[in-house]
Amino acid sequence: MDVRQKTSLPWGHQIARGNMFQAHVHHQFGRNVACPTTYVPVSDNGLYRTPQAGAATALRIKAGGNAADTANGAGARSVRLWGINASGDEIVEDIATNGALASSVTTNQFIRLYMAEVLTSGTYGTQSAGSHVATITIENAAGTQDWAQIQLNGFPSGTTGIGSITVPRNHVGLLSSIQINVDQTKTTDLIILKREGILQTSAPYSPIVKMQEFIGVARPISIRFDVPIKFPALTDLGVLAKVSNGTGAVSVDLEVLMLEAET
């Protein structure tokens, strides 16, 4: 394409191409195949860890994986983590896999982890060969808390599914759309929550507040907000879901535009 054609592309295309100064988009996808009848996060393992700044922790890959998911193996060789540190800044760190053993711990200390994905693999991925062999679990350095999972899901997914995200320091998050998919054999209730002031260390704390609620969802729905919902810096944005009976599968896709140097 020539320059004139490129510059005439719509706003969203320019964002996706990285052409908008101090702006980027997160398509934050989450799934939970076993939502119960009480509210839980829409994430692979039903968790989104939110410790206070004083409890920041290094992370690692949990022991118990597959021997092929190792630094020189046929499976996942390294994993990249995205999250927030105790200063409220976004951090990204790569860690080498270590087969069935626990990996080395990260250099960074995390208070949020909103995405992990396979970075390098020993296998050229195809429709019949994925990029990791087993579920990869991310845990705290002490080995006492699971934080996230890169699951198989019938086929190696290569990434986490976490329907929550946190707005870094010196940014504003604009939620412009949400796609919801549910188990159509039952009804599902979902709520979008926000909690500002994630670095607060003593009361009074900012409350956790319901921003949107969807009751009795029985089919996929897609909602675009003509005026996006604003989430200020240092704010958690999360989706919880519950089903009417038993357990059920739920997935969400959040389109969040992050604007830097905004208040």
Model-derived regions, located:
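Beta-strand-centric surfaces of beta-sandwich/beta-rich domains
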Residues: M1-R112, L119-T263
